[in-house]
């Protein structure tokens, strides 16, 4: 027999103390969603089941005890730290869920210069860790636009990526070891070593699990020397995306690793570079690190781009100014909310990836299908995209779309606009051989395509859920679709 809402709250207070169990209605409503539902949130409308409580966890031991209790009574838990998620992964879709807030677990445990790694609890803000490292002349190399908001546990749980990934890699390339708590309360640690061949890499059971398998409590990541004085900026305008993708490919294949390598189409580029884009596509690069490496990287990029006469160089100071204003902190989020409430104009992104052979077709097919098939295409005020993370064998594509919310209630905006646009992007990307999600995580709104995304490999993911969360208490509806 399931526990009542009141009984759940009482038991949680017994486990962690009354001061750590929040039942204020305003807090509960805010914790029932993430930024995927920012339009109804701005209008004060919350339609999902409100959680029974938000638990402010203070230690791994508390996480263990709380999960043990919840597992015994089959209570759904939603792990949460910085709450910068954008894909619905933090939504509470089950009645009487409990939000497991790890933001109070915010200690930097160790900065180990000799072994070039740093260990932090799940609630340490990335910006706090980064600033502590920069004071010593080092960096994580991880710099998502959410850096002022995001915390370490969520960054690892969502398999996040930073703006300098083409040089430093994504979060999975940075994580050395970690600690996590399984659904039954068992604490597991993966030790910090540079590499091993002792079976499959079990870090990857935890990295990217989105709270659907376990709760990440501590992470150790690599660190790198921080030398911003060596940064070199390059910018170009060009006529078409196909040429831009070809240039990105040549740079990667020839072995150059700029920290930033971005290609904007004309519509998306106009949003950021009105002062010089002139309605054209935009290529941006930054080289950094050891001065000799940065210089060689910059020279290599310039040489490759010079093979394409249509590309026109722009003043590097313009690119540096853009670079210095990239991140989204609390002030930008607050300003966006005011603007949305005032204008009714929404902006979202959906990021995918593909090999070099299919990425341009993905881009063109998605844009064309949205313009010709989406029934509310006339409400779209901007539709474009950019590539911002490249690899030896391919790149990502960020589809960026703004639309006016017309003739619908705030709570209807998602199903009228956002979900149908996501559907087109996911369907076209999978059809053409790409991945429907590059770095935001599946969350609860791309979960409909999880099985199609993985194909015959879905059995492996399904096996992990059965093994590590047999009672299905971990973030129901994320990664794994709810079976009806």
Swiss-Prot record:
GO biological process: lipid biosynthetic process
PROSITE patterns assigned to the protein according to its UniProt record, in alphabetical order: FAD_PCMH (PS51387)
Domain (FAD-binding PCMH-type): residue spans on this chain: 47-226
InterPro entries referenced in this protein's UniProt entry, alphabetically: Alkyl-DHAP_Synthase, FAD-bd_oxidored_4_C, FAD-bd_PCMH, FAD-bd_PCMH-like_sf, FAD-bd_PCMH_sub1, FAD-bd_PCMH_sub2, FAD-linked_Oxase-like_C, Oxid_FAD_bind_N
Keywords, alphabetical: FAD, Flavoprotein, Oxidoreductase
Enzyme Commission no: 1.-.-.-
Family: Belongs to the FAD-binding oxidoreductase/transferase type 4 family.
Gene transcribed to yield this protein: ygcU
EC class of the enzyme, as a word: oxidoreductase
Keyword Transcription regulation on entry: no
One MF term in the entry's GO annotations: oxidoreductase activity
Name the record gives this protein: Uncharacterized FAD-linked oxidoreductase YgcU
């Amino acid at each position: 027999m399931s526990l009542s809402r009141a009984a759940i709250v009482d038991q949680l207070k017994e486990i962690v103390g009354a001061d750590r169990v929040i039942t204020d209605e305003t807090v509960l409503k805010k914790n029932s969603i993430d930024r995927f539902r920012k339009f109804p949130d701005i209008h004060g409308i919350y339609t999902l089941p409100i959680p029974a409580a938000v638990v402010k966890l203070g230690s791994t031991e508390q996480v263990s005890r709380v999960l043990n209790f919840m597992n015994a009574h089959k209570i759904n838990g939603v792990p949460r730290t910085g709450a910068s998620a954008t894909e619905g992964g933090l939504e509470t879709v089950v009645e009487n869920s409990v939000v497991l807030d790890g933001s109070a677990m915010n200690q930097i445990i160790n900065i180990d210069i000799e072994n070039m790694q740093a260990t932090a609890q799940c609630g340490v803000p990335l910006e706090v860790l980064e600033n502590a490292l920069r004071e010593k002349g080092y960096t994580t190399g991880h710099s998502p636009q959410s850096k002022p908001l995001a915390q370490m546990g969520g960054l690892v749980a969502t398999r996040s990526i930073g703006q300098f990934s083409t040089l430093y890699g994504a979060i999975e390339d940075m994580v050395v070891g970690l600690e996590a708590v399984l659904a039954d309360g068992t604490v597991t640690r993966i030790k910090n070593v540079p590499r091993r061949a002792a079976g499959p890499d079990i870090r990857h059971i935890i990295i990217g699990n989105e709270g659907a398998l376990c709760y990440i409590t501590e992470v150790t990541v690599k660190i790198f020397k921080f030398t911003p004085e060596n940064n070199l900026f390059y910018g170009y305008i060009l006529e078409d995306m196909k040429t831009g993708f070809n240039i990105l490919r040549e740079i990667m294949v020839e072995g150059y690793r700029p920290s930033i390598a971005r290609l904007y189409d004309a519509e998306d580029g106009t949003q950021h570079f009105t002062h010089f884009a002139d309605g054209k596509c935009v290529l941006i690069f930054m080289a950094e690190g050891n001065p000799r490496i940065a210089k060689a990287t910059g020279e290599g990029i310039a040489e490759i781009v010079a093979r394409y006469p249509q590309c026109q160089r722009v003043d590097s100071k313009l690119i540096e100014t853009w670079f210095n204003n990239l991140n989204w902190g609390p002030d930008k989020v607050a300003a966006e909310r005011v603007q949305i409430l005032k204008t009714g104009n929404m902006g979202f992104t959906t990021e995918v990836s593909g090999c070099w052979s299919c990425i341009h077709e993905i881009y063109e097919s998605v844009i064309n299908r949205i313009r010709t098939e989406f029934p509310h295409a006339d409400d779209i005020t901007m539709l474009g995209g950019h590539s911002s993370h490249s690899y030896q064998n391919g790149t990502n594509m960020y589809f960026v779309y703004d639309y006016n919310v017309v003739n619908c209630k705030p709570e209807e905006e998602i199903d009228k606009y956002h979900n149908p646009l996501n559907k087109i992007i996911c369907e076209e990307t999978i059809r053409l051989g790409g991945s429907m999600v590059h770095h935001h995580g599946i969350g609860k709104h791309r979960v409909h395509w999880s099985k199609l995304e993985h194909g015959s490999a879905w059995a492996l993911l399904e096996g992990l859920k059965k093994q590590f969360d047999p009672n299905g208490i971990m973030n129901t509806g994320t990664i794994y679709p709810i079976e009806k």
